[in-house]
Amino acid sequence: MNAKEANFDGLVGPTHNYAGLSFGNVASLSNEKSDANPKAAAKQGLRKMKQLADLGFAQGVLPPQERPSLRLLRELGFSGKDADVIAKAARQAPELLAAASSASAMWTANAATVSPSADTSDARVHFTPANLCSKLHRAIEHESTRRTLAAIFADEARFAVHDALPGTPALGDEGAANHTRFCAEYGAPGVEFFVYGRAEYRRGPEPTRFPARQTFEASRAVAHRHGLREEATIYAQQRPDVIDAGVFHNDVIAVGNRDTLFCHEHAFVDRQAVYDALAASLGALGAQLNVIEVPDRAVSVADAVGSYLFNSQLLAREDGTQMLVVPQECRENANVAAYLDALVAGNGPIRDVRVFDLRESMKNGGGPACLRLRVVLNDAERAAVKPNVWIGDALFASLDAWIDKHYRDRLSPVDLADPALLDESRTALDELTQILGLGSLYDFQR
């Protein structure tokens, strides 16, 4: 059946700021307490969506979550009217207010793991929201994520939107940032590839400096839940030393699409065994795996983390070639820029590189791949998606004007104590649900 990959990017929320909440994320920590520009952040992401849609790629948008999360603050013991809750949290525990105000749901690669209907036992598209239990500011996202996905992919005959896995360290799940899929054609059965940082119940190497956020047990549970074929499901461990170097998700060191894996030499434990397993599984489906392995002598792990070379989007074009979408930081790193020039000049599957300014997201550790959730849809499934979430000229214009109307152009961590920010955000989100036709999505609307 004819199918295409759609990308659903997260729209950056009005509370976008740099609070340095993500230990293990080098960019997040290094930009802590600097001023952010929510308006610029949202527009940078929206421009990427529009330009990719203009190139013919299926491009959707996912709305921000309500922030600050008054639900979290009340659960943590702050009481009174909404303004009182914010004031008390700002005075007594500003780090908790920062966690409750994070716009991190913009990085929809962590929203869920998605398996297309060609791979699942019941021939539905399956979504499992990630529990993101390693970080407080992200662990509060999954319920709203489930609600949003259920609103957009509402046809239960075609879509299965699950709850997140239990939020325990043994089942730490970071979503599609540690998952990719290989196939000959999008509509054909494929090989699903899960990458984990550690295993809870068996001994193995683990990082020592930064935590491994994804467990083998979580990856396996998602595969079981989605009804994936064992022979077409591959698990690999990310190298602990690269986690300690700031590779907190696999999508900071590798990206794959269709029959191509683009990765760093040091991405995986026992990398040749990983390549062999993927090649064998994909070969059984009639396709040949192309591995583009970047040697450390050309691009070091430090260069990869600093430029986010691998936190790129690998997009398949109609002519069978692939296009790489990278942040502008890749052009500002001499080693990475030289590698990309040589890559495009070669005769491999990647024939084009597009560069985007995503500086506001990048300063928090999120590149092009972080901002998108990939969903493979056949024609009938695409027709069942809520129509107003697809990016085109009209929706782009509406969202661009909406950002101009509602977003601040400067936000520092101390501004999170401003009770007006909550009112501004709610007003913006209430209008957004009307633009996107999603109904009463947020707690304050119910």
UniProtKB/Swiss-Prot annotation:
Binding-site list for substrate: 19-28, 110, 137-138, 213, 251, 364
Keywords assigned: Arginine metabolism, Hydrolase
Catalytic activity entry: N(2)-succinyl-L-arginine + 2 H2O + 2 H(+) = N(2)-succinyl-L-ornithine + 2 NH4(+) + CO2
Entry annotation: catalytic residues: E174, H249, C370 (nucleophile)
SUPFAM superfamilies linked to this entry: Pentein (SSF55909)
EC number, UniProt record: 3.5.3.23
Stored InterPro entries: AstB_sf, SuccinylArg_d-Hdrlase_AstB
Pfam families recorded: AstB
Any Gene Ontology biological process: arginine catabolic process to succinate
This protein's pathway: Amino-acid degradation; L-arginine degradation via AST pathway; L-glutamate and succinate from L-arginine: step 2/5
Enzyme category, top tier: hydrolase
Molecular function terms from GO: N-succinylarginine dihydrolase activity
Family of this protein: Belongs to the succinylarginine dihydrolase family.
Stated role: Catalyzes the hydrolysis of N(2)-succinylarginine into N(2)-succinylornithine, ammonia and CO(2).
Subunit-structure text: Homodimer.
Protein name as annotated: N-succinylarginine dihydrolase
Organism listed in the record: Burkholderia mallei (strain ATCC 23344)
